[in-house]
Amino acid sequence: VLFRSADEYVEAINQKQAKAHNVIIRSFTMDDDIGTMSYATAQADIKSRPVDRNLVDLFAATDNDVRRRCNYDSKRIVNKIITTKFRSEELCLIIAEAHAHLNQETDALGYLNQLRSKRITQDYIAYTIDNLPEVFQQNIKTDATGIPLTKLMSAILCERRKELFVEGDRWFELKRNGRPEFWVAAKGKKFITEKYLYTFPIPKADIRLFPDLLIQNPGYIE
């Protein structure tokens, strides 16, 4: 079974350690003092600010999507626990995206709809090429190949964002899809993410050791 019911999804997604239902790999399997403290700190941190309005807008047309109440509450505070697992649902979305890149639209829609049918609990309508929503206005504008998003690719990436919220995917999603530039406000300040920030700088000590071999990554002052 590739996907479980909505109720089974809710049960599985709230298991911090258990390999429940469609979990393939777990990276957090046991508690220790440091791990528990780090996990608690991270969980508290994500509750310290409301969920991005852009994510909330993704659910605007699908009030019956079970992930909406799992992800955040009416005040946009995160409900979902931080998840460090690889689930079969992500594998399905990877397959859907691969088919989309190959222009195999029917296959891509098939995998996308398999997942959606298990998350939208009432009034579910399968996507077709004719009824796909318009390209969602978000930070990501191009796909992994640099091509502007099609309706199908936009739908797949939107589904990834809803399904993999606080599962450690978002930064990689941004990096592989055009490294978009955007800003966020925090603690009264404006923080801008520029393209070069998706790559870490090479430590200066390493450059000094191998000056003829290493060149600092673009955007960083040597």
PLM regions: where:
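Acidic, serine/threonine- and glycine-rich low-complexity intrinsically disordered segments
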Residues: 38-41
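Active-site PLP attachment segment
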Residues: 43-45
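Acidic/polar-rich alpha-helix caps and helix-coil junctions
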Residues: 1-34, 53-222
